[in-house]
UniProtKB/Swiss-Prot annotation:
The gene is Stat5b. It comes from Mus musculus (Mouse). GO terms for molecular function: chromatin binding; DNA binding; DNA-binding transcription activator activity, RNA polymerase II-specific; nuclear glucocorticoid receptor binding; protein dimerization activity; protein homodimerization activity; RNA polymerase II cis-regulatory region sequence-specific DNA binding. Upon activation, forms a homodimer or a heterodimer with a related family member. Binds NR3C1. Interacts with NCOA1. Interacts with SOCS7. Interacts (via SH2 domain) with INSR. Interacts with CPEB3; this inhibits STAT5B-mediated transcriptional activation. The lineage of its organism: Eukaryota, Metazoa, Chordata, Craniata, Vertebrata. This is Signal transducer and activator of transcription 5B. Belongs to the transcription factor STAT family. One of its GO terms (cellular component) is cytoplasm.
Amino acid sequence: MAMWIQAQQLQGDALHQMQALYGQHFPIEVRHYLSQWIESQAWDSIDLDNPQENIKATQLLEGLVQELQKKAEHQVGEDGFLLKIKLGHYATQLQSTYDRCPMELVRCIRHILYNEQRLVREANNGSSPAGSLADAMSQKHLQINQTFEELRLITQDTENELKKLQQTQEYFIIQYQESLRIQAQFAQLGQLNPQERMSRETALQQKQVSLETWLQREAQTLQQYRVELAEKHQKTLQLLRKQQTIILDDELIQWKRRQQLAGNGGPPEGSLDVLQSWCEKLAEIIWQNRQQIRRAEHLCQQLPIPGPVEEMLAEVNATITDIISALVTSTFIIEKQPPQVLKTQTKFAATVRLLVGGKLNVHMNPPQVKATIISEQQAKSLLKNENTRNDYSGEILNNCCVMEYHQATGTLSAHFRNMSLKRIKRSDRRGAESVTEEKFTILFDSQFSVGGNELVFQVKTLSLPVVVIVHGSQDNNATATVLWDNAFAEPGRVPFAVPDKVLWPQLCEALNMKFKAEVQSNRGLTKENLVFLAQKLFNISSNHLEDYNSMSVSWSQFNRENLPGRNYTFWQWFDGVMEVLKKHLKPHWNDGAILGFVNKQQAHDLLINKPDGTFLLRFSDSEIGGITIAWKFDSQERMFWNLMPFTTRDFSIRSLADRLGDLNYLIYVFPDRPKDEVYSKYYTPVPCEPATAKAADGYVKPQIKQVVPEFANASTDAGSGATYMDQAPSPVVCPQAHYNMYPPNPDSVLDTDGDFDLEDTMDVARRVEELLGRPMDSQWIPHAQS
């Protein structure tokens, strides 16, 4: 069902929220009459931070205007005449509004569509059995909204009380002036004759006594009104503090935690729009109460009456200033975090946002935000309010940006699009700590003027910790530092303290989250996979996951100490698995065609009762990012065979599916699925040509084909009897595939258009030297390409 049809079925508060999304910036009539066209456009494909995408945004604006004009032209009849005029007016209005800033139109429509989807989803979840979590969230949000309504009513009540106090005081002042006038009349009685003076004096005395009695009584009433008003403001501020604590210390902190976990591959942190609407309501109510308190102070100064009110007002004024200060400083947040693995001399982006910028008119005097990089120790000093001015750990280019107010979405934000870390200054490292364990942070600071320079706040916010690298080879270990920090950081920590040890189930959760995100798969790590990983990490043979639940994993075990008998850490091995899956094997993993997390003995145990030609794919234990084929073929020499592991470089030359298609004696994918049924859709389709076919230039085309020497004769012997070795790839694919002898190499080291990297080149040289000089391990059957 189209989103707009569902949106029209919203009711109550959800319907009001949906209607509030529209206005002069984007009329709801445009959404209604162009609903199908709007929902069919790829609004999310445009990168709002990339100026080069401006062309796409302009095309969308032009398309929208054309569709509106077309819709207007098709209107007929009396009612159609009015609609024709209205739609034509909207076309002109939108063209005029967004002609110079088409990106704002994209931002506006994305904002609208996102919130419509959210409202529809919340409405649907609320009516489904699976919506218990959504129900709990809705209940919490309902409670917050009810508290806002209570605060609104209380604030309206204190406004009425303040007006009553003001009117009472104004009348009191008038009567007080009358009392002064009577006193002046007493002074003039001496000019009258005795009889008239006596008569006049008696009348004035009676009037004066009556008026003074009234003034004394009214002064007490005024004082009582003032005390009652101050007490009501105290109660309002208590409720405001409670509401602000829920929003800032609960909801906003949860959003930041989701943002942190999203850095590990968790679900997106979600929109800030609901949080911003709450913060704006807080700002509005706080500011109204602050203005009321200041007016009450002015009334007290205008007519001083001895009593406790002055002290009470001074207290509530200080309290509300603290509240608004906390609101402004806490709602200056990083909407889009900088990359947590930050390479020097590389462009990066970030976005900061003030959630109360529109309501407090901060945008009337657009503030400038500055970004600097500081060390972990400098971040600690900053939070202790120690003087760290101009104490930075590096130089960032393009690090200043003016905050912009986006009328369509009501957001005040600064988009740093072209920052680059020019240099970094490292601190002395502790013990075995490497450069990829050193944490920095990007500090964003600014100065906000609130209420027409009435209040000025210095605001600062820190990014999630970043690890600075100077070469791509450091990325693996830097990612481990970031993963550990994001997963196990505790709320309110001292920067950037993390536990040195965590329970194995906690690490399992983090690894699974990262794995699914990196491989971009819903097929995560199974219980059996986690048992295999635990065996690898702890060097224990138990097959029960429960046996590992109480065991702890230290950071050193994770990515500082090598695994027993290996020259790599647990994380380096796991990251290699993710890398090869992500780059070359993702569809096969999603199909369940890769068993992966089994060792050699487990593979043999699984294959022992299977027919010859059954094979499985498992991750190599000796080669980072390697995957090997284990298969069963009972011969005089052996029963189980293991092919030398393939790596990313191998799959860059020839895909896994094509390699498996070459090996005709591999028949069944474990447990019993025919190989071609699983892999044929991934074979490279090549037109069948005679073996002697020549290219236009007269050259004979070479072939690249996977060959295992021990099985080469059997797999190519077409005249032999029908054995398992005679199995060939699917008949729809030509078995004799032709390839260029030198296929494009994705390795940046060999890219003639790229930068020459000596270290990467030496890595390749060392690898080739190692392969040439390494004695053949009897556990592997070498593979070749012919």
